[in-house]
Every structure is written in C-alpha cells, then in structure tokens.
C-alpha cells in the first residue's frame, strides 16, 4: 500500500487557524471519504528540538523548515491519480492550494 507525504508551509497570507478549520471541515473528511484512501493524518511541526546527528553542521534553525507534514495511506494509487485528473479532483487540489506555499511537494515512501 503506497504512502504519500505532503511536506509544506502555509502561504504568508494564510492564518493557521483558518487552515486548521479548512482541514477539519473539508480536506480531512474529503480525502478520508474517497475509496482509494485508507488513512489521512496531518501534523503541524511546533519547534526544533535539537540536532538529529552527533556532529551537526552549522547552527540549528530556530524554526522547522516545514510547518506541516500530511501522511496519506493509499489503497489504489491508480484510482487516486485518476481522481486527481477529473474536474472534481482538480477542484479538490485547487481548494488546498489556496493555503499552501508553492514549494509544497508530494513524496511517496514505504515503511523500512
């Protein structure tokens, strides 16, 4: 089962509270309600705790490089991609794009 991650920041013009309401009311129920999604969770990165290596290079950033990470468990990647190509899928992505910085990326990974 593929796992997708969206790694992103909000646009400077967007407020976190408005985005959180959008997630709760629209995005999370919308994705969880699709036949190809088995799970969808989003995490907000709060702060940098410390280095993750014994000999870090340079100074630690004061803020996390990304504000959010979304994890989407996909049961049928072809069905998801097909949905994203429809008008409804394009509108779904467009509604999310209102909030997200244009450097947002999707990655696909698997558990190690």
What are these regions (language model features)?
Residues 1-112:
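Macromolecular interaction modules
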């Amino acid at each position: 089962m593929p796992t997708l991650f969206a790694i992103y920041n909000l646009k400077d013009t967007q407020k976190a509270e408005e985005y959180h309401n959008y997630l709760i009311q629209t995005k999370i129920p919308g994705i969880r309600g699709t036949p190809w999604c088995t799970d969808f969770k989003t995490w907000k990165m709060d702060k940098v705790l410390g280095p993750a290596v014994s000999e870090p290079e340079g100074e630690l950033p004061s803020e996390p490089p990304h504000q959010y990470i979304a994890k989407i468990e996909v049961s049928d990647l072809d069905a998801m991609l097909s949905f994203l190509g429809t008008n409804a899928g394009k509108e779904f992505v467009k509604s999310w794009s209102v909030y997200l910085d244009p450097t947002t990326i999707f990655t696909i990974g698997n558990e190690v």
